[in-house]
């Protein structure tokens, strides 16, 4: 009997309400699923192994059913109708680029960092975007990694903070569905471009589930042009990324969606660049070893190259006579500083730079220059769909109406940066907001959001059967 119990234990270890679940918690098992290293220290290796062997994606909402999803469809159809009265554009006719800039953070926002004033500002152009685009801080669910999770959030509008467990949706969620809804489905043509290997995070398989028309990567049937590496770095530069972005823009006459993923500033940061003017000019309390200062100087030089490449790219799209909107975002902090410092600077070390820029032609045809600062200083990656649709003055579907209401009415929703279960709410000043302070309307929005996310991560995808909900 004992042997049978031990055999069956992993199968129900994390399932609420069962006998094994209660035995598990009788051992004072403190599950967080956010920080595996800390979990081992708190729970020991055996309990931690059992915690992770049978992950629950989300708790099932009490009233989850086809009728519950249909109710939300009807509810947000009405919201979409109201929103669309003030919108005139069809996003399908736009060219929209979601540009994941690998590990991009404004170097001046690192905690305690000091860059010698004699050194040039490495990100002067990107900082200048504050005055002519929607611009602010993006809250990342990762530190030094988690690229695919940020990409999943941008494409789906769903949120890592809603998960019960630490997981990678591209690997552990998306493959469970034959089709997976993304912003790309709202366009007649969608593609992804990545001047690196395409197999990481099951991207090739998942983009098929997204019904992307094309994925250009190193070794694919679609050639990556103008491959250029900087200094001793083994990664293709951001110039390569944007040259291929321009190529894709010019290949289509009408609107399209492009998921543009860079690689230049990926770790490690091993003094790649000759004539690096930031070497010896970086200091700060957290930059207390020669090795860390050298890595930071290398990273800063990389951001300078990014800044120049972005400036060139925006100059190019401004000359193109079709509406183009660029959503630029850093996916996470680089792994220069020890992750242990995130406990001291939880929000700061999970905040990257983002901006949303609509080219001259788009602005001449109804797109906004920038959105109100109040709701955009701190955002989550999952907010980008709603923000892009607002900036391009595009009509929304019922699902996008839900995302729009969440962005407008709620603080930014993100993972709990302290490593605890559940999501965290961050206001426009970068400060946590307690759930109990939310209004009834705000709490209802979160409940609706959780229901839809459960449906497309652990549920039966009833929303796909509701005509027009996603598209």
Listing of model-derived features with the role each one plays in the protein:
Residues 1-93, 117-136, 169-177, 304, ...:
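N-terminal secretory/membrane-targeting segments
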Residues 78-87, 100-101, 106-471:
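Solvent-exposed soluble domains appended to multi-pass membrane proteins
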């Amino acid at each position: 009997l004992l042997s049978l119990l031990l055999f069956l234990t992993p199968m129900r270890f994390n399932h609420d309400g069962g006998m094994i679940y209660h035995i598990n918690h009788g051992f004072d098992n403190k599950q967080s699923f956010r920080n595996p290293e800390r979990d081992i220290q708190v729970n020991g290796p055996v309990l931690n192994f059992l915690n992770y062997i049978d992950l629950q994606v989300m708790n099932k909402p009490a009233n989850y059913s086809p009728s519950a999803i249909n109710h939300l469809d009807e509810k947000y159809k009405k919201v979409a109708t109201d929103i669309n009265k003030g919108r005139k554009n069809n996003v399908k006719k736009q060219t929209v680029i979601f540009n994941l800039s690998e590990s991009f953070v404004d170097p001046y926002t690192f905690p305690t960092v000091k860059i010698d004033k004699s050194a040039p500002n490495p990100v002067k152009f990107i900082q200048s975007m504050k005055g002519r685009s929607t611009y602010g801080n993006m809250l990342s669910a990762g530190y030094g990694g988690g690229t695919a999770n940020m990409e999943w959030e941008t494409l789906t509008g769903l949120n890592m903070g809603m998960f019960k467990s630490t997981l990678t949706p591209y690997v552990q969620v998306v493959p469970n569905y034959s089709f997976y809804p993304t912003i790309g489905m709202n366009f007649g043509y969608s593609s992804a471009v990545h001047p690196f290997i395409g197999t990481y995070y099951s991207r090739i398989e998942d983009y098929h589930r997204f019904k992307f028309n094309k994925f250009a990567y190193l070794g694919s049937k679609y050639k990556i042009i103008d491959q250029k590496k900087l200094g001793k770095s083994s990664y293709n530069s951001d110039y390569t990324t944007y040259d291929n972005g321009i190529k894709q823009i010019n290949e289509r006459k009408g609107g399209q969606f492009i998921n543009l993923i860079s690689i230049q500033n990926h770790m490690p940061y091993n003094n790649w660049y000759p004539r690096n003017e930031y070497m010896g000019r970086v200091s700060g309390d957290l930059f207390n070893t020669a090795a860390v200062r050298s890595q930071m100087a290398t990273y800063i030089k990389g951001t300078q190259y990014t800044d120049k490449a972005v400036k060139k790219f925006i100059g190019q799209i401004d000359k193109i006579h079709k509406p183009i909107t660029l959503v630029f975002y850093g996916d996470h902090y680089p792994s220069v500083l020890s992750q242990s410092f995130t406990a001291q600077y939880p929000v700061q070390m999970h905040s990257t730079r983002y901006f949303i820029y609509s080219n001259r032609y788009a602005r001449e045809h109804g797109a906004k220059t920038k959105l109100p600062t109040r709701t955009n200083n701190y955002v989550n990656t999952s907010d980008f769909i709603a923000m892009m649709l607002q900036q391009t003055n595009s009509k929304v579907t019922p699902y996008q109406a839900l995302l729009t209401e969440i962005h407008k009415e709620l603080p930014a929703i993100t993972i709990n940066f302290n490593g605890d279960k559940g999501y965290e709410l961050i206001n426009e000043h970068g400060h946590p907001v307690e759930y109990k302070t939310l209004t009834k309307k705000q709490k209802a929005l979160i409940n609706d959001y959780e229901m839809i996310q459960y449906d497309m991560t652990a549920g039966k995808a009833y929303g796909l059967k509701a005509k027009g909900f996603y598209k």
